[in-house]
A protein has these predicted regions:
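Intrinsic disorder/low-complexity segments
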Residues: 4-5, 31, 61, 70
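Short, extreme N-terminal segment that most often corresponds to the first beta-strand
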Residues: 1-19
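Short coil/turn segments at secondary-structure junctions
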Residues: 16-21, 69, 73
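Low-complexity, compositionally biased segments
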Residues: 16, 24-26, 83, 87
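Polar/charged, Gly/Pro-rich intrinsically disordered segments
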Residues: 47-100
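Short, flexible N-terminal segments of the mature chain
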Residues: 19-43
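Arginine residue identity/basic-tract feature
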Residues: 7, 36, 83-86
Length: 100
């Protein structure tokens, strides 16, 4: 297994205003994204114990996103996984949660 650390933030202003409950939408999207990231990273041979996504309803108290692996090539692969998974999870979320 390749070592990996991923810390991502979902901010309320990035969710958009079309949801009736922005906080519920943010929490649901963060949960979906974390699950999909763990799945995709695990399939690529990364340890998934240190992957987390946190929703923040305000800009206070959040840190910058962080993607780290113990080798440069692995880190580049992990960054690609994060980018692709973030996009596909957002599409999946929007298509399946139009009632939030």
């Amino acid at each position: 297994m390749k070592a990996a650390t991923v810390r991502l933030n979902v901010l309320s202003d990035s969710i958009g205003s079309e949801w009736s409950d922005i906080d519920a939408a943010g929490e649901a999207y963060a949960s979906l994204l974390e699950s999909r990231l763990q799945q995709s990273a695990g399939e690529a041979g990364f340890d998934t114990e240190d992957i987390s996504v946190t929703y923040h309803s305000s800009l206070a108290g959040y840190s910058t996103d962080s993607v780290w692996a113990d080798q440069l090539e692995a880190e580049e692969q992990l960054q690609d996984i994060v980018r692709n998974t973030r996009e596909s999870a957002w599409i999946e979320f929007c298509e399946s949660n139009s009632t939030l």
